[in-house]
């Protein structure tokens, strides 16, 4: 099942789409500079591109952690990104009242993993009519995503994307079950499935409020996921991850973006040049 996002076709058998950008908006200048690099690289490589960033990280572990620029300022920044680069934008919402204002600016609205079973939020998102990206909760099996999908469909919106972001593996660790991609496709009517490699790299230190990460393994994990024939890749970068205000240890250094995507595209092209082989 394919979904249209402006002039971009998103489907498990179509060339992969990059949902890329920064974890959280820090300021206008850094946002535009980062987006400009993404646009330059993706246009050079012929990769369909959607800019991503959060205006508010409402689920930070510590009350003292940076959350973002807020809804009003965030929407102004997204408007400037769209005006300057002419690309679609995705961002996440956390409360029902945010859905309509965000839908008026952004092309895709994201349901955070921790909030994926909140029915009132699901209903408010569905009512916008926008394309919805559903983050799979760390605590949910791939097959259980069908229940969230059904909520959206009952609320009148079937324009859905499913996003893997890792599963809890004991305490303070995440793993990615590569078989889960196929399970989500099978149980949810072959909706587009994308892979959030960045957040799948997170680790926790029991003594710290900040997330750790394994960015050195980003390419290995991304290639493994994309080998399962996915609709897209979800990726966060930063010009200097050590200075990032959220999830720096999992962010790809921005200067490595082109070499990273060259490898992802080569694999995606190879996988999708072959007919689907069904094994019963």
From Swiss-Prot:
Record's subcellular location: Cytoplasm
The reaction(s) this protein catalyses: D-arabinose 5-phosphate + phosphoenolpyruvate + H2O = 3-deoxy-alpha-D-manno-2-octulosonate-8-phosphate + phosphate
Gene Ontology cellular component annotations, sorted alphabetically: cytoplasm
Top-rank lineage group of the source organism: Bacteria
The protein's annotated pathway: Carbohydrate biosynthesis; 3-deoxy-D-manno-octulosonate biosynthesis; 3-deoxy-D-manno-octulosonate from D-ribulose 5-phosphate: step 2/3; Bacterial outer membrane biogenesis; lipopolysaccharide biosynthesis
GO biological process, alphabetically ordered: keto-3-deoxy-D-manno-octulosonic acid biosynthetic process
GO molecular function: 3-deoxy-8-phosphooctulonate synthase activity
Keywords attached to this entry: Cytoplasm, Lipopolysaccharide biosynthesis, Transferase
Entry similarity comment: Belongs to the KdsA family.
Designated name of the protein: 2-dehydro-3-deoxyphosphooctonate aldolase
UniProt organism field: Neisseria gonorrhoeae (strain ATCC 700825 / FA 1090)
């Amino acid at each position: 099942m394919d979904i249209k996002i402006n002039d971009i076709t998103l489907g498990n058998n179509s060339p992969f789409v990059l949902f890329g950008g920064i974890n959280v908006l820090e300021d206008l200048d850094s946002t535009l500079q980062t987006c400009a690099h993404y646009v330059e690289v993706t246009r050079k490589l012929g990769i369909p591109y959607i800019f991503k960033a959060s205006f508010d990280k409402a689920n930070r572990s510590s009350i003292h952690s940076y959350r973002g620029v807020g809804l009003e300022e965030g929407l102004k920044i997204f408007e400037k990104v769209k005006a300057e680069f002419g690309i679609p934008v995705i961002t996440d919402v956390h409360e029902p009242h945010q859905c309509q204002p965000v839908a008026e600016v952004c092309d895709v609205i994201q349901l955070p993993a921790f909030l994926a079973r909140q029915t009132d939020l699901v209903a408010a998102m569905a009512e916008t009519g926008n394309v919805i990206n559903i983050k799979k909760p760390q605590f949910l099996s791939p097959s259980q995503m069908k229940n969230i999908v059904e909520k959206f469909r009952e609320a009148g919106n079937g324009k859905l994307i499913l996003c893997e972001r890792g599963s809890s593996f004991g305490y303070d660790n995440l793993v990615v079950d590569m078989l889960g991609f196929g399970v989500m496709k099978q149980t949810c009517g072959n909706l587009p499935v994308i892979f959030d490699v960045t957040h799948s790299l997170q680790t926790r230190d029991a003594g710290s409020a900040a997330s750790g990460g394994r960015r050195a393994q980003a390419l290995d994990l991304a290639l493994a996921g994309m080998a399962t024939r996915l609709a897209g890749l979800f990726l966060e970068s930063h010009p200097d991850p050590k200075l990032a205000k959220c999830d720096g240890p999992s962010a790809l250094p921005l200067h490595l973006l082109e070499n990273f995507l060259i490898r992802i595209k080569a694999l995606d092209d190879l996988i999708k040049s072959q007919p689907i082989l069904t094994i019963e």
